[in-house]
């Protein structure tokens, strides 16, 4: 198996990493970086509250554990080549308690975190296919800032929610993107 087909969450994290949304992070974290972020909420001497990981299931790990290079695909489209792949494990219950709090067992993402993250991967990447590393609802921060400058907008308000955007949110975003 020289291919890894990634899921929607991994694709989203990958796009965000490549577009500096998680700045100063440029890659999925290594084990040492993960522990530093969880314990100190810090990465490269800057506040960083949650590690951005690339987890794989037990099934995928059993197929790829001896390889060091792969091609990443999302929805059958080539994204990039990854190499210098290293795998690591963590005490997921201990980590979950730090991430989700003392009632971590009741947290909606706890079971998903355990199920989807048998092992974690850290790697370098090359040969990105930029065209396939885009999403119609994503605008890179750098492009968004340029649009603001062009329109001479000096004030901006925003909001954030943990909830998944529904159709009304998508319509609002689409409407606002067309305005810019």
Residue ranges and their predicted role:
Residues 1-170, 174-180:
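Non-catalytic terminal extensions that flank enzyme cores
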């Amino acid at each position: 198996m020289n291919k890894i087909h990634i899921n929607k969450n991994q694709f989203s994290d990958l796009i965000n990493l490549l577009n500096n949304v998680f700045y100063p992070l440029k890659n999925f974290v290594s084990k040492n970086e993960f522990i530093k972020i969880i314990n100190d909420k810090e990465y490269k001497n800057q506040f960083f509250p949650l590690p951005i990981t690339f987890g794989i299931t037990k099934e995928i790990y059993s197929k790829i554990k001896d390889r060091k290079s792969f091609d990443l695909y999302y929805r059958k489209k080539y994204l990039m080549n990854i190499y210098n792949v290293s795998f690591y494990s963590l005490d997921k219950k201990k980590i979950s308690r730090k991430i989700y709090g003392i009632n971590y067992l009741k947290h909606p993402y706890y079971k998903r975190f355990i199920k989807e993250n048998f092992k974690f991967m850290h790697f370098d990447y090359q040969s990105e296919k930029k065209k396939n590393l885009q999403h119609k609802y994503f605008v890179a921060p750098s492009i968004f800032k340029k649009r603001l400058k062009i329109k001479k907008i000096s004030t901006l308000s925003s909001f954030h929610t943990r909830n998944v955007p529904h159709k009304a949110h998508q319509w609002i975003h689409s409407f606002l993107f067309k305005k810019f």
